[in-house]
Curated annotation (Swiss-Prot):
It is found in: Cell inner membrane. Pfam families: 60KD_IMP, YidC_periplas. InterPro entries: Membr_insert_YidC (IPR019998), Membr_insert_YidC_N (IPR028053), YidC/ALB3/OXA1/COX18 (IPR001708), YidC/Oxa/ALB_C (IPR028055), YidC_ALB_C (IPR047196), YidC_periplasmic_sf (IPR038221). Residues 37-77 are annotated as: Disordered. Required for the insertion and/or proper folding and/or complex formation of integral membrane proteins into the membrane. Involved in integration of membrane proteins that insert both dependently and independently of the Sec translocase complex, as well as at least some lipoproteins. Aids folding of multispanning membrane proteins. The chain crosses the membrane at residues 7-27, 399-419, 469-489, 514-534, 560-580. Interacts with the Sec translocase complex via SecD. Specifically interacts with transmembrane segments of nascent integral membrane proteins during membrane integration. Belongs to the OXA1/ALB3/YidC family. Type 1 subfamily. This is Membrane protein insertase YidC. GO terms for biological process: protein insertion into membrane; protein transport. Residues 37-58 have a biased composition (Low complexity). It comes from the Bacteria. The keyword ATP-binding does not apply.
């Protein structure tokens, strides 16, 4: 049995090493290195003269420069000083700035800043001259014959509609001195997708060439939730023109260092993403374009994701229409998936498996738009985990209960492996007398003892590592669930029961202040809530199902492991801790049933009795 205990402890130790090692030896040094790099970059920028990286507006030139923001003002004043068209939909409120037809005022009605439903709703986009300027705009680059074309300073006129809703689009117009008339129809669905249709009519006497462009601009670098658990910053999917698409990501720090990255593409999309929100542009898919992620230090520092299409030519008396999509909102999985065109076999399989998930979302067939949500390298495991959890949620209406049901489903999936694990443990226990005889026979001759043990395993058809593999195989499941709880907006502010009001946040209670009975806040390093303690108890019970290892070092690990995990998971999302506690509970029940079926004594009560007897003896 000692051999099996050693395998069990090795599996748990590996789990701890993976979690702690990843945190302390991978994440923390890189976070610190990034912080130092950012400080050095900022110091260098302070010494470097400001440069304007967007020269004039030739048809084959760069994008027109941004109008520099004036002194920072309040958001209310910035919105009030410009003529605007109101936005009022089921999901959104805000307005479109008629100067530049810029979307720079957008709030998300369905999301609050805190779990308190009376707290302010989330503000996503802000005017340029506010502290957190963040906006999207679309324009044109003209040539010598085109005259002035729509850009950042163009003042548009409202032709139709005063309020943009799901059912009432608005139309803006602008006519320049050469006879070009620009008509912009803006519509929005009931979620977060804006459709911008630009019709350009040439009433002049010469061919006119225009290059459409679009950009998402963000002033100042936002605070990111994490550096390596998920991606926040620039994101896009670029098409090569032959039906193939590649995902592109860039951190803010990387673009600060490089100033900009460029790529030529046909089809796809690009923008800026946060943990839960995003603003992205989908250029006209039939035109090739130059994409760019950039960082400017001229005046107020800003980050920008932009594209410039190849020029289109409009003959005299003719017109052309170009369609651009703009996503600005919450990264809800069904909505994002509904907008996406996923040609991979994996994506098609899930589309068929969960038919109906897209039915409530208007179809846009945006190439691989589902990658807007960072499912990570284990996409094939993380997304199915969420889909299963979401399925249960739609049945019971509570994500906490959905986590419990998902755990049961995972347990059923791993049941054959778990059965082998516990059967192996039972067989190892039956072989314990023979193993003790071999130890007595060979004494300190480890080589001879090992060979004899292997012969015994072979004769009895026992695999000594069979009990280890099921535990190791569940580690990716743990990380997949962690990723789901951490990145999906569906988990944000999702309640369970009692004191758990946000499954994506740590348990808010703490034993230091007696779980809220004492009137003070506990130190962060000592913050240990009720659910982590419950998890520690279930892990303690699970480990006591097996005999205590005779080796002192193994016995020490055996005793300390639940306590280490309890404190380690104290800062993890409550949903993950609930999963682990429930998983331990199911494992205890499962192990009890299987061991009883094999006629093996369950060691739980004997171990507990022995533990307390040893402690009692030490105190005498």
């Amino acid at each position: 049995m000692m051999e099996n205990n050693r395998n069990y402890l090795i599996a748990i130790a590996l789990s701890v090493m993976v979690v702690l090692g990843w945190q302390f030896f991978y994440m923390n040094p890189r976070i610190e290195a990034q912080r130092q790099a950012e400080q050095a970059q900022q110091a260098q920028q302070a010494k470097t003269p400001a440069t304007q990286a967007t020269p004039g507006a030739a048809v084959n030139g760069a994008l027109p420069g941004q109008t520099q923001a004036s002194a920072t003002t309040s958001r209310e004043d910035a919105v009030a000083k410009s003529a605007r068209v109101e936005i009022n939909t089921e999901a959104l409120s805000g307005s479109i700035n008629l100067t530049g037809a810029r979307l720079d005022d957008l709030r998300l009605k369905g999301y609050h800043e805190t779990v308190d439903k009376t707290s302010p709703i989330i503000t996503l986009l802000n005017p340029a001259d506010t502290k957190d300027g963040y906006f999207a705009e679309i324009g044109f680059i003209g040539g010598e014959k085109s005259g002035s074309v729509p850009g950042p300073s163009t003042v548009w006129t409202v032709k139709d509609g005063q309020t943009l809703t799901e059912t009432t689009p608005v139309t803006l117009t602008y006519t320049n001195e050469t006879g070009l008339t620009f008509s912009r129809k803006i519509s929005v669905d009931k979620h977060y997708m804006f459709t911008i249709e630009d019709t350009v009519a040439n009433a002049g006497g010469a061919d006119i060439s225009l290059a459409p462009y679009g950009r998402v601009t963000r002033y100042n670098k936002p605070a990111v939730a994490s550096t390596y658990v998920l991606h926040e910053g620039f994101i896009g999917v670029m098409g090569s023109g032959d039906g193939k698409f590649a995902s592109v990501e860039a951190k803010y720090a990387a673009i600060e260092k490089e100033n900009e990255t460029n790529a030529k593409a046909t089809g796809g999309w690009l923008g800026i993403t946060d943990k839960y929100w995003a603003a992205t542009l989908v250029p006209p898919q039939s035109l090739a374009y130059d994409s760019r992620f950039s960082h400017f230090t001229d005046g107020q520092a800003r980050f920008q994701a932009d594209y410039k299409n190849d020029p289109v030519t409009i003959a005299p008396g003719q017109s052309t229409t170009l369609k651009t999509l703009l996503f600005a909102g919450a990264k809800e999985v069904p909505v994002v998936d509904g907008y996406a065109l996923d040609k991979s076999w994996f994506g098609q399989a899930f589309t068929n498996l969960f038919a109906g998930a897209k039915d409530t979302v208007q179809q846009y067939d945006i190439p691989r738009f589902d990658l807007l949500i960072d499912w990570g390298w284990f996409y094939f495991l993380t997304k199915p985990m969420f889909k299963l959890m979401d399925f249960f949620f739609r049945q019971v209406g509570n994500f906490g209960v959905a986590i419990l049901l998902t755990t049961i489903a995972v347990k059923l999936l791993f049941f054959p492996l778990a059965s082998k694990q516990y059967a192996s443990m039972a067989n190892m226990k039956r072989m314990q007398p023979k193993m003790e005889e071999l130890k007595a026979k060979h004494g300190d001759d480890r080589m001879a003892l090992q060979q004899a043990m292997m012969e015994l395993y072979k004769t009895e058809k026992i695999n000594p590592v069979a009990g280890c593999w099921p535990l190791l195989l569940q580690i990716p499941v743990f990380f997949a669930l962690y990723k789901v709880i951490y990145i999906t907006i569906e988990m944000r502010h999702a309640p369970f029961f009692g004191w758990i009001h946000d499954l994506s946040a740590p348990d808010p209670t703490s034993f230091v202040n007696l779980f809220g009975l004492l009137p003070f806040e506990s130190p962060a390093m000592l913050h240990l809530g009720i659910w982590p303690i419950i998890m520690g108890i279930t892990m303690f019970v699970q480990m006591r199902m097996n005999p205590t290892p005779p080796d002192p070092t193994q016995a020490m690990l055996f005793n300390w492991m639940p306590l280490v995990f309890t404190f380690m998971l104290g800062s993890f999302p409550a949903g993950l801790v609930i999963y682990w506690a429930w998983n331990n509970t199911l494992s205890v029940l499962q192990q009890s049933i299987i061991m009883k079926r094999h006629g093996v004594k369950i060691e739980l009560f004997d171990n507990l009795k022995g533990l307390f007897q040893r402690k009692s003896a030490k105190t005498k």
